[in-house]
């Protein structure tokens, strides 16, 4: 008898609202910088959500879509709430709970390393795993990587979300500026920078490709002008 099967069936049962609410709250926290319930793993009756109706609606939608997490992310990310500006006003500058403006948040260690790999065109090799494995796909904490450790990837010693420390520190700044993670990838002979130099494309094309690879958008006119001036020097 596989006891995991009835457990999974109970967790995902439409009658078990706790699981759907917990998953929904976590994804709100990951995408919005703050969950409807905070801390995001402290789901209890004495810690009510900031917007109970929204949590209930998203949870019911998750159940209706058979716990399709991609659909949940799509629902959140195509909402007006997710697309609000991060610029605050005099009226909402102090708001940290009700999503009156988008909350700027730091990218966690794993997707940050994956983003660097994408921007530079050089994949990180993890021990005993095939080249091309993303940091976000690591099965457990038994794959040491200095960058991930420096940027607070948790050791998964507990189930508490508090194990991942969101605060910046000096070691992260120094490693970004002087460490070998970025420097090695930028200088890689098979990386994006080397390929752009070898292709002999214009400065404008170089800037456009790097912006798209790093930020998933084209540079603005002012950014393009400033970057062209820098490359011309």
PLM features: residue spans?
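Primarily short, surface-exposed interaction patches in extracytoplasmic proteins
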Residues: 1-128, 154-164, 183-233
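Generic structural signal for residues positioned in beta-strands
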Residues: 6, 98, 115, 134-137, ...
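Long, His/Glu/Asp-enriched segments that create or flank divalent metal/ion-associated functional microenvironments
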Residues: 120-123, 127-129, 136-137, 141, ...
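Amphipathic alpha-helical surface "interface" segments used
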Residues: 134-142, 194-200
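Structured, non-catalytic alpha/beta "coupling" segments that mediate domain-domain communication
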Residues: 168, 176-186
């Amino acid at each position: 008898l596989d006891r995991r099967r009835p457990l999974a069936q109970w967790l995902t049962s439409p009658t078990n609202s706790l699981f759907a609410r917990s998953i929904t709250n976590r994804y709100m926290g990951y995408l919005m910088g703050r969950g409807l319930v905070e801390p995001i793993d402290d789901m209890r009756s004495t810690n009510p959500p900031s917007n109970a109706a929204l949590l209930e609606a998203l949870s019911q939608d998750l159940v209706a879509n058979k716990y399709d997490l991609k659909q949940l992310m799509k629902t959140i990310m195509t909402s007006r709430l997710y697309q609000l500006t991060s610029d605050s006003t005099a009226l909402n500058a102090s708001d940290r709970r009700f999503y009156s403006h988008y909350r700027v948040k730091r990218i966690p260690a794993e997707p940050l390393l994956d983003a660097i790999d994408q921007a530079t065109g050089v994949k990180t090799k993890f021990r005993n795993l095939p080249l091309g494995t993303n940091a976000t796909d690591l099965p457990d904490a038994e794959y040491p990587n200095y960058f991930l450790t420096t940027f607070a990837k948790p050791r998964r010693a507990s189930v508490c979300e508090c194990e991942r420390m969101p605060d910046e520190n000096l070691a992260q700044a120094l490693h970004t500026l002087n460490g070998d993670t970025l420097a090695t990838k930028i200088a890689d002979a098979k990386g994006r920078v080397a390929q752009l130099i070898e292709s002999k494309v214009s400065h404008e094309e170089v800037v456009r490709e790097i912006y798209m690879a790093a930020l998933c958008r084209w540079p603005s006119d002012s950014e393009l002008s400033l970057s062209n001036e820098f490359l011309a020097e």
